[in-house]
Structure formats: C-alpha cells, structure tokens
A protein has these predicted regions:
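Short, solvent-exposed alpha-helical surface patches in non-cytosolic proteins
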Residues: 78-79, 83-90, 177-183, 199
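A short N-terminal beta-strand-loop micro-motif at the entrance of redox/enzyme domains
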Residues: 67-74
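Functional-site microenvironments in short loops/helix caps that host divalent-cation chemistry
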Residues: 30-32, 44-45, 51, 55-56, ...
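Short beta-strand-to-coil "C-cap" segments at the C-terminal boundary of structured domains/repeats
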Residues: 343-350
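GGW-centered surface loops in extracellular recognition modules
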Residues: 36-44
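Bacterial Sec-dependent N-terminal signal peptides
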Residues: 1-32
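C-terminal, low-complexity/hydrophilic appendages and adjacent surface loops
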Residues: 59-64
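Short capping motifs at secondary-structure boundaries
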Residues: 74, 89-98, 188
Length: 352
C-alpha cells in the first residue's frame, strides 16, 4: 500500500586488509560435492563462512562493504512455498491475507511523513500491486509506471478479476505480505531465513556472482525465470514464462535449492537498513540477525523488510536482482505480484 502512496520502488585500508585476510583463509574452503540431505521438502544447508555483499560493477551502495560472515547449519525449503501449500494453510486456519483486507488508515499514516493527506477512499481498499507491461520505453526510475494498485487481487486471483491459480498449484504463491509469510511460518512451525542465511544458501557454498556460477543470465540456456528483452515492455520469453514459473523449472544451485534466482522475491526476517553492512566493516558477523530497526535514507518514514532473489521481472537494465548479493526491500504490509517466500528451520544441537 505504501508503495502506491509514495513513488517507488569504501572500504578503508584497514577493513580491506581484514577482508583480504579472511578471504585468503576461507577461499579454499568452498563447499563442493556435498551429499544433499533432504527431509520433508527441506535441504540441510551446512554451516560455513563466506563474504557477504558485493563490490562488483552492478553492486548497489547497500551491498557494501563486503564483510565476512559465519552461518550455522540449518534446514531450508527446497523450493518457494507454492499455491498448493499455501492453500492447505488457508483451509486449515481460515487466515485472511493482507491483500484481502482493507488498510487501516490510522495505522498506515504512522509510517508516512507527517501531515501526509489521507488518500482517496479508492486507494484504501483491499488490493495489491500488479505488474502491467508498458507500450514502450519508460523512465526506469519511475516504478509507478508498471505497478498498478488493484482491488480484487490476492494470492487466489494474482492478476485480479478473471484470473485464478487453477492449474498453477505448483507455482509460488504471490501477493504475500511479510506478515502473511510470518503467519504461515508459525502454522508450519518454521521461520523466515535471516538475510545472511539466505545469501549463504543462495551461494551454494561457492564464491560466485549468481546461484548457478558467473555466466551472465542472458548467455546460453535459461538459468532462471527473469525478464529477457527490453523491460518493461518487451519480453522475448526465452525462458518460456511471462509471469511465475512452476517451482523447480530450472537447475538447482550446488546446495540443491531451486529458484534462488528469479521467479519471485523472497521475504527474509530482517529489517532493511541501508547502512547495516557498515557495522561489520572490520569484524566478522556471527549468525547476524539483522538490525534492531529499519533505516532507509531515501524513505526515512517507511519501515521495510528485506527481500532477496529477484523475480520474473528482473533484468540487467534496472534490477539484476538474481545476483546472490542483491538486496531489495518492501513494506511488511504490502503484497506484490512478484513476491513470495520460502522457510527455514534451525538445527537443534544434540542434547548433552
């Protein structure tokens, strides 16, 4: 909802030396050819050390400084949560998603700049954000050109009136807010991954740009469900999908996880802080849980949660969200057509 009200969507010498020494220590410890332990649709992700963030030519400012992180072992869903799985949750609990509820203006205005006028009642309705391709080239900094706030849109009706998830039960569920994913996680007795867990899992234990390696997404056979062609008006459909794809349609990463790039953005548990990585500039992060509070200098009144992995809309011209280190954020009460989630479980230490 807030995305519609406002227009969206150096490492110093000492820290650089610290990073170099850490990398030299762990670069030869890439996790390769591990046996894939799978249980109840989840893959065991081993503990490991890696360099979180990026400094390459496509990296955004919030991806730096690159810093060393250790993550304990955990279980992670092999795929994104599907419509079939989410329907089981709805049938069992009667839960009503954010997109199916009318926004509460009194709560909404607390996270907007002071004196923001109340929007027209036509906006204060049960709705979600839907992608609409444009007729031609547009300003890629103006996300509102291709995102439309529409009523009667939800996980059941991903494109609104006349659409359905019939014959798409193996597609990732979408129009899911962060709060919705939390409700599902509680029911499933799992949790959302931390941002660090997510990036380690996406890397597959190897130091590569993408979950599949370093080859550009546009080279060779399709590697993920992303936007091929000219965004947001011409998709060549090289990967055969305009919107979501059935989970597992592309090759898994070295850990055996599917769709860690493209298809849908995935919620993480962390608040989004634009400057969060700076707190690890000269020290290792040990199972970081994210910042205590959100911070975005460009949207200072908005409380946002981290999303990872990119979506079917990602294209190098403006997004490249399918890079392992790429970060995105959104309001936790906002549903979007390109956003879903997957869950994790902690591995309990054996009793002594």
């Amino acid at each position: 909802m807030k995305l519609e009200i406002f227009k969206n969507l150096q490492i110093n010498l000492l820290s650089g030396l610290f990073i170099f020494l850490f990398f030299a220590k762990c670069a030869n410890k890439e996790v390769k050819n591990l046996p894939k332990v799978i249980k109840d649709g989840m893959v065991m992700i081993p503990s490991g050390d890696f360099l979180m963030g990026s400094s390459d030519e496509q990296a955004r400012d919030d991806e730096s400084p690159v810093h060393p992180v250790h993550v304990n072992a955990f279980w992670m869903d092999k795929t994104e949560v599907t419509n079939f799985q989410f329907k089981k949750f709805i049938d069992a609990t009667g839960y009503i998603t954010t997109a199916e509820r009318k926004p509460d203006w009194e709560e909404l205005k607390k996270e907007l700049p002071p004196n923001t006028p109340k929007p027209n009642d036509s906006l204060l309705k049960a709705a979600s954000l839907v992608f609409e391709a444009t007729d031609g080239p547009v300003n890629l900094n103006d996300y509102g050109v291709w995102w439309q706030w529409k009523s009667k849109v939800s996980w059941r009706y991903p494109k609104g009136k006349g659409s359905s998830i019939e014959n798409k039960m193996d597609h990732p569920v979408v129009h899911i807010s962060w709060y919705d994913s939390q409700a599902y996680a509680a029911w499933a007795e799992k949790r959302l991954p931390t941002e660090a867990e997510w990036e380690w899992a996406a890397s597959g234990g190897v130091n590569k740009k993408y979950p599949w390696g370093d080859e550009a997404v546009t080279n060779g056979e399709p590697k993920a469900n992303a936007w091929e062609g000219s965004f947001p008006y011409k998709n060549t459909l090289k990967d055969q999908f305009f919107y979501t794809a059935p989970v597992g349609s592309f090759k898994p990463n070295p850990f055996g996880l599917f769709d860690m790039a493209g298809n849908v953005w995935e919620w993480c548990s962390d608040w989004y802080d634009y400057t969060y990585y700076e707190s690890f500039e000269s020290q290792r992060g040990n199972n970081p849980q994210g910042p205590e509070a959100p911070y975005d200098p460009y949207q200072p009144y908005l409380r946002q949660k981290v999303m990872r992995g990119g979506s079917f809309l990602c294209n190098d011209a403006y997004c490249s969200g399918y890079r392992v280190a790429s970060r995105m954020k959104s309001s936790p009460d906002t549903g979007l057509q390109h956003t879903g989630f997957r869950l994790v479980k902690s591995i309990e230490s054996p009793s002594k």
